[in-house]
A protein has these predicted regions:
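Phosphate-end processing signature that detects enzymes handling 5′-triphosphorylated RNA
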Residues: 1-191
Length: 191
């Protein structure tokens, strides 16, 4: 499945997270783990390609994100839990559109490795302004809190997100993507 992902996000303080958690109390949290993939040299990042395997309780997903003028084009392959778990060990790519795109873009599949993982406990539901997710993320020695809103219309979505934050007394705090925050911990560890 492919789609254009347009989302807005903000980091949250623990207090802001706890306040919003009350709005999401009707939603059962789901724990998912993202395994981030690149070469040791960062070839994927230099080509502006972002690749992950996500494991969830009921299935797994292989996802490739490619930045567009607005949002990211997202390519997804759904797999069962066993396939996803096996892929986190072997990185043996199924024949799929993602594999084809990587090869077309000159990525040497044998050089890819899993850099590490980030685990998210997510409460997600469809609101009247878009698909909203309240996340707790744990990676390396860090824990952060985040609110995301996925929308179809970039301009209206931005206005709706800003209004939601104001209505709920949330101060906007710029949030890099999860993969960027994760990779920043790798760079810090090297210093």
């Amino acid at each position: 499945m492919n789609h254009l992902e347009i989302e807005y996000k903000t980091l949250l303080t623990k207090d802001e997270y706890n306040r919003l958690a009350m709005l999401f109390s009707h939603v059962t949290p789901v724990t998912q783990t993202n395994y981030y993939i690149d070469t040791i040299q960062g070839d994927m990042k230099s080509k502006k390609l972002y690749l992950r395997i996500r494991t969830l309780p009921t299935h797994g997903e292989l996802t490739l994100k490619i930045p567009e003028k607005v949002g990211n084009m997202e390519y997804n392959v759904t797999m069962d839990c066993a396939e996803a778990k096996a892929m986190t060990k072997s990185l043996d790519f199924p024949d799929c559109q993602i594999k084809s795109i990587l090869l077309e873009r000159g990525v040497t599949l044998e050089d890819l490795t899993i850099l590490g993982h980030l685990t998210t406990t997510r409460r997600e539901y469809q609101t009247n302004i878009g698909l909203m997710a309240l996340d707790v993320n744990v990676y390396a020695d860090k824990k952060d809190y985040e609110l995301e809103l996925e929308v179809l219309d970039a301009e209206k979505g931005k206005d709706d997100f800003d209004a939601f934050l104001k209505e709920n007394n949330i101060n906007f705090k710029y949030a890099k993507s999860k993969v960027a925050r994760f990779v920043a911990t790798l760079k810090r560890d090297k210093d």
